[in-house]
Amino acid sequence: MKGEPKVIERLNDALFLELGAVNQYWLHYRLLNDWGYTRLAKKEREESIEEMHHADKLINRIIFFEGFPNLQTVSPLRIGQNVKEVLEADLKGEYDARASYKESREICDKLGDYVSKQLFDELLADEEGHIDFLETQLDLLAKIGEERYGQLNAAPADEAE
């Protein structure tokens, strides 16, 4: 089915963000795991995989519209050098995605593409869940300090990889 070019463009814009998020969350997973934040690392891994599923849905929709998914470029990664920076970097990415998806859903609505609008609504709901988690973690980190936060997010030595 031939798709509306503006919708295909917005789907590719979202793919750009999701592919960057896959890589950023995966690298943060590996860094956090290495730093001993194994529980938070596990969450970052789960987020990376979820973002990969988002990318797959976008690719599928672009192909359905006889468009070409652009996997050549990804959004720039924001990589934290400590646990606080990791959380802040991820939060910035989620804020960017939320703003983009809000705009995209409106464009799809105006063009009468309710299925793509629904996809953006689904992505938006997931990103808002990520935002809530990250904001909560940053608030917790500020309240209890990095040392205690680290204790909460480290697995016992016999559970580490």
UniProtKB/Swiss-Prot annotation:
CDD domains in the cross-refs: Bacterioferritin
Cofactor(s) essential for the protein: heme b
Any one biological process term the GO annotation gives: iron ion transport
Keyword Heme: yes
Chain sites annotated for binding heme b: 52
Signal sequence, renumbered to the chain: none
Domain of life from the UniProt record: Bacteria
This enzyme's EC code(s): 1.16.3.1
Catalysis performed (reactions): 4 Fe(2+) + O2 + 4 H(+) = 4 Fe(3+) + 2 H2O; Fe(2+)(in) = Fe(2+)(out)
Ranges of residues in domain Ferritin-like diiron: 1-145
Similarity comment: Belongs to the bacterioferritin family.
Assembly information from the UniProt record: Homooligomer of 24 subunits, arranged as 12 dimers, that are packed together to form an approximately spherical molecule with a central cavity, in which large amounts of iron can be deposited.
Name under which the protein is recorded: Bacterioferritin
Source organism of this protein record: Brucella melitensis biotype 1 (strain ATCC 23456 / CCUG 17765 / NCTC 10094 / 16M)
